[in-house]
Amino acid sequence: MELKEFFKGFEPKSDKNTSHCYIDQYYNDEFSSKKENNIILLEIGVREGFSHILWAKYFTNGQIWGIDNGESGFDYSKLLKDTNIHCINNDAYNANFVNTLPKEYFDYIIDDGSHHPTHQKLFIDLYYPLLKTGGKLIIEDIQGMGYFTMLI
């Protein structure tokens, strides 16, 4: 089953399959052959947790990690009923915090946090060491090509 099938019924709660079209334009091709793998995915920006629930249902053998600053007021304990979801309430762009996370551990790290260019640059600098060999950093919502060139 294609990844976009998992997102049906979650619109507009998750924008990954609607306004941004990340499912069709990237995620389906990237993840479809890895559905049964023991993927360890970290996503910054839990908010209400809808994408984390979907990632956990899709990667049934995987571990889904999320970091959020808690500003949405969402009770993350609701997500923790699923044994392959882990949520951390902290500032994802704070170097002291990020240095407490395991190095060379994650297959994918997605930045769906503040969407601010300075945070996106920090994301690259701080989270690259946390990737396994062959792992990928993914930044959602880059604000334009001018900001993209600032990131590289």
Regions found by a protein language model. Give the residues of each.
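A short alpha-helical cap/connector motif
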Residues: M1-I110, S114-I152
